[in-house]
């Protein structure tokens, strides 16, 4: 009756409630015009409706399919066409599978609250492969025991919802849900789904709206490859995988998600999370994940506003817990509450905003590699390491580019790598500050070739640990830092501060809490080699222990403040300082060297204490220095061979006030520090200050200076050039006489002698005063002719002498110019014939050739002379006759000659003024 040809559809159709149907129910390849509603019926055998066409609904709700005939299916409905809905809610299948493959259902397919205990030969409990459902497929809270759900290549136009279902696929199926190639025009939801023996395979799924697989539980064997697979998926909305629990991995490789992708709170016993190569238009979150034996792979992914990662992770074979190499994030990256046994890889990553890390605890990478690797990464918005960051291994930012600052919160900790480096940022391009205050590095910090637009701030940082394998300290080679290097309260332990070929736009500063302790096998504490410092060096009170501090060959545009510092050996050889060099109260255990320094300001060694352990070395060596200001050695105390200032030039004053040079006595050798009770007690002998062949405007010394036993002078001033001397009576008056005899003083020698004479007279020694005046008078009588010439030419400054010499040279040059260009000089009165030669006013007749020129003379007209013309034209005051009889023609070359002679005339006038001033000064002096 249902399938009789010509039967008209009935709005009521066939409705059976609670019927028991013994035998087969077969409507295969039939057309059913009426709705069929079989509610609560019991079917002893299988239902076969394969190829049938239903013009209305087909309902089997609350029915029981027993399949006692032994067929592998309980419902065979492949290639069925249903114009209405197919509702299988609350059915119970005792044996066999539901085969609905390649069916066309215009309405809704509902399989809610069903229990299916059977499966096909392929291990499938519900088969919808290739089916098309117009109004959605709903399988909520359904139990599949023994088989899988296969929805391969199916197309659901409204939605697909498997929420709360329980699938125990114990058969031969490869997955609990086989959904590769599935297409859903609406939502795909599998919230709270539980799978006991197989994964969920949704590879290549296409969903126009969101996909929700949250709180899914996927159990399986330990060797299960994956729990959920969404590789190559296309999701038009959000992808929500929050709270998945499973054994294997969760993969979404090469997928495309137009909304947010949420991988939060995923716990995988043996698996990992992989989104490699995926494209996520929205936020990608993987926070509070638990991967005790897995890692997170986000390499080559493209992420929208935010990438957020956090949780407990293990590592892969390469030692990486988070692999984000080549990732492209439009917005920011947040690493929050991340604990891993491996490293975080951001090599060659592109981050459009900020990289932010907080509560970070990372292990080392493979082979002891870095805990965080940002090599060649590009970060537009800066990098920030917040509170509670602890990296067991080093941080690598080699050749990275960061568009803003790089900031570390206090007490951020970094371990050392195999090379002893804790932070490696060689080649870093940073457009802001490197702010690393109070960080703790178990190894060194290396920034070779870095480019920083801001400050390099290490205030309060601890670099290196005592006894660690690191010997690096702070190393910056070939870098350019536009800001300053700030080392206040910085502690460099078991290393050194090395700056080589580095340009610093600001200052390099430390303070009394800055400590640089060299390693036991190193002889270097500080090295500034070939550095350019724009703002000065301020190391007031800095302590450099255990090695040499070499600041030589550095070019410092500003001052150098090293006062109160403690050093081993301090070297400033070849250094150029744009301001003052302050070494007040400095302490040096192994000597101070200032050789060949160039200082625009003054050098102040006031109250400094310099110790030299090698008695053959100078305590202070400042030979060949050039100081534009003063050299103040007041209160200097040294222990060594001597203070050497040979051939130094001091434009200002040199003060030898209360200078004490001593050698160690045997009783002093056991004292530590070496200058305890410095300069007092028995066994201390005075040394000598060597200032031979030096130059200073003024010398200042006092009565504390005395020559030691066996030394001719307390201060050796042989060949010194000076203009004035101030001081008190010296203990040994012979030293004063020898000083006068050995000092070359082109000006003021008599005044110096008179100064000493007044000092000796006031001290009750008139005989010594008389002898000083005799020495001075003998020197004045013995001046040579060369001394007179020097006095005349340079006594009132070098400029008059040079001006006169330049005037003569300029006249000689202009003579040569006039001789070479003589063809362009014509007579002022043109002579046309011998008859007219004697005329008072000769006139040129048209067509006639002049008989007088600069190259041809006449008895009746003065000849042209190049030298006298040059003198007459450039020095008008002489009043010669050449300029009256000869002039330059109006040709192009002639106009150039006129310009040259005009310029020469102006120059000669200026030089003449300088010469006149010098002559006037000489006459006034005489």
Predicted regions and their residues:
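N-terminal leader/targeting and pre-domain segments
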Residues: 1-787
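Short, hydrophobic/amphipathic alpha-helical patches that form generic packing surfaces
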Residues: 1-3, 755, 791, 815-819, ...
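Hydrophobic alpha-helical transmembrane segments of multi-pass integral membrane proteins
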Residues: 79, 808-816, 907-915
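Generic, well-ordered alpha-helical scaffold segments in large soluble proteins
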Residues: 759, 763, 772-775, 816-820, ...
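Pore-loop/selectivity-filter region of tetrameric P-loop cation channels
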Residues: 786-800, 824-909, 914
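Alpha-helical transmembrane segments and their helix-start/interface "positive-inside/aromatic belt" motifs
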Residues: 799-808
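Juxtamembrane "helix exit" motif at the C-terminal ends of alpha-helical transmembrane segments
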Residues: 810-833, 917-924
